[in-house]
Amino acid sequence: GCTKFMGSCKTDADCCEHLECYKYKWCGWDGTF
């Protein structure tokens, strides 16, 4: 599965759709809809 909002990540690929891996290593909104 994918990592949901505020979940920990290593790369953008770890995160669910419309999320990206922020520099503090959690998934946040990537600005897309």
UniProtKB/Swiss-Prot annotation:
UniProt key word Secreted: yes
In-chain residues carrying the UniProt-annotated modification Phenylalanine amide: F33
Tissue: Expressed by the venom gland.
Keyword Secreted: yes
One Gene Ontology molecular-function label: toxin activity
Compartment annotation: Secreted
S-S pairs: C2-C16, C9-C21, C15-C27
Superkingdom, natural source: Eukaryota
InterPro entries: Huwentoxin-1 (IPR011696)
Location (main, coarse): secreted
GO CC annotations, alphabetized: extracellular region
Pfam name, any one: Toxin_12
Keyword field: Amidation, Disulfide bond, Ion channel impairing toxin, Knottin, Neurotoxin, Secreted, Toxin, Voltage-gated sodium channel impairing toxin
Membership in a protein family: Belongs to the neurotoxin 10 (Hwtx-1) family. 47 subfamily.
UniProt comment concerning the protein's domains: The presence of a 'disulfide through disulfide knot' structurally defines this protein as a knottin.
Function summary: Gating-modifier toxin with very weak activity on Nav1.7/SCN9A and Nav1.8/SCN10A. Shows 22% peak current inhibition (at 10 uM) on Nav1.8/SCN10A sodium channels. Show peak current inhibition and delays fast inactivation on Nav1.7/SCN9A (EC(50)>10 uM).
Protein name (database record): Mu/delta-theraphotoxin-Pm2a
Organism in which the protein naturally occurs: Poecilotheria metallica (Metallic blue ornamental tree spider)
